[in-house]
Amino acid sequence: MNYQVLLYYKYTTIDDPEQFAQDHLAFCKAHHLKGRILVSTEGINGTLSGTKEETEQYMAHMHADERFKDMVFKIDEAEGHAFKKMHVRPRKEIVALDLEDDVDPRHTTGQYLSPVEFRKALEDDDTVIIDARNDYEFDLGHFRGAIRPDITRFRDLPDWIKENKALFTDKKVVTYCTGGIRCEKFSGWLLKEGFEDVAQLHGGIATYGKDPETKGQYWDGKMYVFDDRISVDINQVEKTIIGKDWFDGKPCERYINCANPECNKQILVSEENETKYLGACSYECAKHERNRYVQANNISDNEWQQRLTNFDDLHQHA
């Protein structure tokens, strides 16, 4: 495999994010890189793909900058690009928590746990493990015994914690996310909220899965990633599938977006059921006049109406 996917972040001061974004985009395009990078006055958060040579040049370029000299890159090998375009965007935050009183992880953040230390926390009955990701990420894969917050956006996590505070009272709290960036700010917020014993998986799930000692142990399913790959393996010890097909509940790890562009809900669904239910999550979405699955597959009106009757069987067995 001649390509690599990089995942990285750094909380550091960037004085002029707009100018930085413009210059950085030009550099990335000159090196044929593709991906998504967010920059703000608080730092950088990025994931991109390119050939091994070009991604190595990118990492060297970043490490030559005093602000990013010690930035850690999580690296995955890939068959080709994991993104279709290159975006570098200035933002208010590099990860959107939207707090009234913002947290600076450089001053306030939870204790860092190495993969081995985190594995011990997973085995400790007096420790509560909070998944700091969204519900659809959790449903594809998560650490055994972790708590699943009922959220679809990171910014909703603080409110969910406040509503469920009883679950965590007088417990050691450990949190994790994909690459670590969400936990940097979230664990800092937990400390400001009065939680005393707060820790985080340093480097996130991505680092834990590559650790030679832990080998992804106690991870079930796959890890959701925000690129064309959709998911990657983490557990090198045992393979489990925890995702369930939206329609029949069978084991499934295949995510699609609902074919109704006004819905776009992410659902786990087999190829067979995607065909059967017109790529949609519901009857209403399947019959939507702008159904992308119908358009992409040139399905005739007669066939469309015929497949819509498949939803009748669903309701009969519900």
Swiss-Prot record:
Keyword Oxidoreductase: yes
Highest rank taxon of the organism: Bacteria
SUPFAM superfamilies: Rhodanese/Cell cycle control phosphatase (SSF52821)
Enzyme Commission numbers on file: 1.14.-.-
A molecular function (GO) term: oxidoreductase activity, acting on paired donors, with incorporation or reduction of molecular oxygen
Listed InterPro entries: Rhodanese-like_dom, Rhodanese-like_dom_sf, Rhodanese_C, TrhO, TRHO_N
GO terms classed as biological process: tRNA modification
Function per UniProt: Catalyzes oxygen-dependent 5-hydroxyuridine (ho5U) modification at position 34 in tRNAs.
Protein name: tRNA uridine(34) hydroxylase
Organism per entry: Staphylococcus aureus (strain JH9)
Lineage of the organism: Bacteria, Bacillati, Bacillota, Bacilli, Bacillales
Protein's gene: trhO
